[in-house]
Each structure stands twice: as structure tokens, then as C-alpha cells.
Regions:
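Short, surface-exposed linear motifs at loops/turns and structural transition points
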Residues: 1-203
Length: 203
């Protein structure tokens, strides 16, 4: 919210009739109470009190936790809970490797959402990488951001051990391993692979 006057008074010429005045130097997002007045030699009279609220930057109350994570993409979103009284010109998501990403980055989406909840695809990511994402909305007074949310893209599983083969007979044996990380996605297949040649020699 910008700084500005907490009170003001405007004097405009003289004479009876209808008049208008431009009120300047006000603070953004502030409610003011106003009365018109007229003065003559007998004193000052006032019109009925009315109020107005100046416009401000939008309010982005939510950055959604990204879903549908893959190695290179995700789906995120946000909620614009207030337009600030002015038209939203652009909104979307912005992300990066550091906290508090801003729209000066090229890694952002541009949506047509002007209020409420929206979703947006996050693309061009690197697997197994942690990102920070914020929803944003812009009007002519500036840009506001939602909270920081972190997410990590999917990567291949981590197999931390191959078990020692046991129960060896002439035609069978028992093998196994340990999967210490699923890489951020469900493991759809697992097992033991073998050959009569050293696997490291096969390239």
C-alpha cells in the first residue's frame, strides 16, 4: 500500500451550482469519508457524508501446491481474492530455483484469470530439482504475489543395494535389492536383472 494523505481539503472558486473536483495525493487501498461544503458570510454548511475506497494492487491469497508432477512439468495454480478495485491485466505463476521468484524471470505463465481460482501448467523443468513457485496478479498499480510453495520434480528411483544372492541351487537362486527412493513417483516395476556376462562389461 502506498503512502498518501490521511486528510484533504479542496477549495474550488465561488458561486452556487454543481461543481466537481479531482482529489489527489491519496493513499492506495484507503477508505475516505467526504462531505462537500459551501461558505458565505454567515458561515459554512456541509452536504451529506459519503465514502469511497481508493484502488490498490490485487490480493493473491493462495499459491496451490503443484500436482501431476513429472520429470519436466507440473500443474499449479492460485487464488486471486481481490482485484484491488482495478482490472487485472495479467496473472499466472512464476517459478525459479530461489525463494520469492518475481515476474522479471522468464520462467512464468501468463493467464487470463481476472479473479478467483486458476490453474496453470509449469513446464521446462529439470528432473529431481526443487523449485519455488508463486502465483501472481497484476493491475495498473502493480503486481502482488501469493505465498512461496516448494516442489521437487520426479526423477528415476534410487536402488541403494543389490542383495547378496542366496539359496543357490543348480537351476535357481534368490536375489533382491533395496529401493531407497521412489524418485517422487510410484514404482511401477521392480526386480532383478542378470546375465552370464558382467553387466558392467556390456555398457
Amino acid at each position: 500500500t502506498s503512502t498518501g494523505a490521511s486528510t484533504f481539503s479542496v477549495t474550488l472558486g465561488s458561486g452556487a451550482g454543481t461543481f466537481t473536483s479531482t482529489l489527489t495525493g491519496l493513499a492506495q487501498g484507503t477508505t475516505y469519508f467526504v462531505r462537500s461544503f459551501a461558505t458565505n458570510v454567515q458561515g459554512t454548511s456541509y452536504g451529506a457524508e459519503t465514502s469511497f475506497t481508493t484502488q490498490t494492487t490485487p490480493t493473491v491469497s493462495v499459491t496451490a501446491t503443484p500436482t501431476s508432477l513429472t520429470t519436466i512439468s507440473a500443474v499449479g495454480g492460485g487464488t486471486i481474492s481481490s482485484t484491488g478495485g482495478a482490472t487485472i491485466t495479467t496473472s499466472g505463476l512464476v517459478w525459479g530455483a530461489s525463494t520469492n521468484p518475481e515476474i522479471t524471470l522468464s520462467t512464468k505463465t501468463t493467464n487470463g484469470a481476472t479473479s478467483g481460482t486458476f490453474t496453470s501448467s509449469i513446464t521446462g523443468l529439470t528432473q529431481g530439482t526443487t523449485y519455488y513457485v508463486r502465483a501472481y496478479a497484476t493491475n495498473y498499480l502493480g503486481t502482488s504475489y501469493g505465498p512461496n510453495i516448494t516442489f521437487t520434480t520426479v526423477t528415476t528411483p534410487t536402488v541403494s543395494a543389490t542383495a547378496t544372492v542366496t539359496s543357490i541351487t543348480g537351476t535357481s537362486a534368490t536375489g533382491g535389492g533395496t529401493i531407497s527412493s521412489d524418485g517422487g513417483a510410484a514404482v511401477t516395476a521392480r526386480g532383478v536383472f542378470g546375465d552370464i556376462l558382467r553387466l558392467s562389461d556390456k555398457g
